[in-house]
């Protein structure tokens, strides 16, 4: 069970870092052109 907890913590940490960078530097590509 500990492995599952460590995996969850790792994924959550990477997610927080990803969103922090994503919101700090908004994509320059308009979202309307992506679709």
Curated annotation (Swiss-Prot):
**Taxonomically, which superkingdom?**
Eukaryota
Q: Which InterPro entries match?
A: PSII_PsbT (IPR001743), PSII_PsbT_sf (IPR037268)
Q: Return the GO cellular component terms, semicolon-separated.
A: chloroplast thylakoid membrane; photosystem II reaction center
Signal peptide range: none
Which residue spans traverse the membrane?
A: 3-23
Protein topology in the membrane: Single-pass membrane protein
GO BP terms in the entry: photosynthesis
Keyword Thylakoid: yes or no? Answer: yes
Pfam family of this protein, just one? PsbT
Its keywords, alphabetically, are: Chloroplast, Membrane, Photosynthesis, Photosystem II, Plastid, Thylakoid, Transmembrane, Transmembrane helix
Q: What is its main location?
A: plastid
User: Any idea where this protein resides?
Assistant: Plastid, Chloroplast thylakoid membrane
Does Transmembrane appear among the keywords? yes
UniProt subunit comment: PSII is composed of 1 copy each of membrane proteins PsbA, PsbB, PsbC, PsbD, PsbE, PsbF, PsbH, PsbI, PsbJ, PsbK, PsbL, PsbM, PsbT, PsbY, PsbZ, Psb30/Ycf12, at least 3 peripheral proteins of the oxygen-evolving complex and a large number of cofactors. It forms dimeric complexes.
* Task of the protein: Found at the monomer-monomer interface of the photosystem II (PS II) dimer, plays a role in assembly and dimerization of PSII. PSII is a light-driven water plastoquinone oxidoreductase, using light energy to abstract electrons from H(2)O, generating a proton gradient subsequently used for ATP formation.
| Family named by the database record | Belongs to the PsbT family.
For this entry, the protein name equals: Photosystem II reaction center protein T
Report the gene name.
psbT
